[in-house]
Amino acid sequence: MKIEVKDSTMIKPSAETPGGSLWLSNLDLLSPANYHTLSVHFYSHDGSDNFFDAAGLKESLSRALVEFYPYAGRLKLNGNRLEIDCNNEGLLLVEAECDGALDELGDFAPRPELNLIPKVDYSRGISTYPLMVFQLTRFKCGGVALGVANEHHLSDGVAALHFINTWAHLSRGAPAPTPLPHFDRSSLSARNPPQPQFSHAEYQPPPTLENPLPHTDIAHSRFKLTRDQLNSLKSKFKTAPADGGAGKSYSTFEVLAGHIWRSVCIARGLPEGQETKLHIPFDGRGRLQLPPGFFGNAIFFATPIATCGEIESNSLNYAVRRVSDGVSRLDEDYLRSSIDFLELQEDISKLAQGAHSFRCPNLWVISWVWLPIYEPDFGWGKAVYMGPWAAPFEGKSYLLPNPEKDGSLFVSITLHKQHMERFEKLFYEI
């Protein structure tokens, strides 16, 4: 399939907005340099003549930027610290056409060679590129793809979807959803003086392979688990009874993350003494009681570490318990300690997580199940699929909801090709 760009427009707020600079928290500064997260929303044609009318979308996007004005700004340095310059330069909306049809994309596995998202030019410096970039691609079947590139220093997935859903509301003639965005990040300031209470393994270098693997191709696959399969897997696990109690059931995420971790460890066939670190992003909004509509990064990490031998020789319950213990540890004291720990670092950006963090022998499991990824309705119905579109990194996996809302979900994972077939077999042994 070929994609041809037809138009590019810099969209600015439709009314006057505040200027000045927006302070970035330590969690914002953990984002990698020169990096936008990439995702795509796919919409089937609903038969209307004005399906995803570009003029209307530009107008509603301009109005959405009045409330979400930092997206029209640019990054800048204040001394050695990044911040957002709310200079009203705008965000980019690209229009394109594709000579293929949506059904040719199959299960919508990421195909980075298919340019559904504009490439951001980082070569001219941080003050030159937009913080949010959209691409509206029309397929020959009439369907469209809305590609999104979000600069992570400004917002995490929760905040970005808040903006996109506001745009969608305005596009279809509905009022903007509440709450309004809350840009003040002072609730994530470090204490004075900083008081870290823990060693914070999540910010320590990940384990490396004792015996490096030869260079091999990687494979990306997506696996579906039905509601019945999930319930069957989850029903096998309960925490140990405490003080004569009945014990507490593990969450679906804890069970599934443990199952993925163990299956990956076995599929990789690493030595028993090889350490493996599981990275689990965690939204801290609730436990820190951040203001409604908090707009920024509120992502912390649970990072249980074990040897491959411990994961493989014990039952699945061991891996699930390690996941549960890691997530449970992230209480308010731990999260505040994390912010203080970062405050004491000379260069927070050196702790940014990336491909080096979760490649073999490690793993990244992130859940988008709780994100409202299928909420954005621009007036022509909701997406038939939404998911990541970045070049797949080995060791990265996503839990994705089914748009049919039938209780099933998908696991999208990237592994070395020689490990994927074994992983699939182990994954379905439930």
Curated annotation (Swiss-Prot):
Assigned EC number: 2.3.1.140
The UniProt record lists the keyword Transferase: yes
Active site, UniProt feature: H152, D377
Function: Involved in the biosynthesis of rosmarinic acid, a compound with antiviral, antimicrobial and anti-inflammatory activities. Can use 4-coumaroyl- and caffeoyl-CoA as hydroxycinnamoyl donors and 4-Hydroxyphenyllactate and 3.4-Dihydroxyphenyllactate, but not shikimate or quinate, as hydroxycinnamoyl acceptors. Can also putatively catalyze amide formation with D-amino acids as acceptors.
Annotated region described as Disordered, given as residue ranges: 178-210
Coiled coil: none
Keyword field: Acyltransferase, Transferase
Record field: pH dependence: Optimum pH is 7.8.
Domain of life, per lineage: Eukaryota
InterPro entries xrefs: CAT-like_dom_sf (IPR023213), Plant_Fungal_Acyltransferase (IPR050317)
Gene Ontology molecular-function annotations: rosmarinate synthase activity
Catalysis performed (reactions): (2R)-3-(3,4-dihydroxyphenyl)lactate + (E)-caffeoyl-CoA = (R)-rosmarinate + CoA
Gene, per the UniProt record: RAS
A Pfam family that the UniProt record links to this protein: Transferase
Family of the protein in this entry: Belongs to the plant acyltransferase family.
Name of the protein in its database record: Rosmarinate synthase
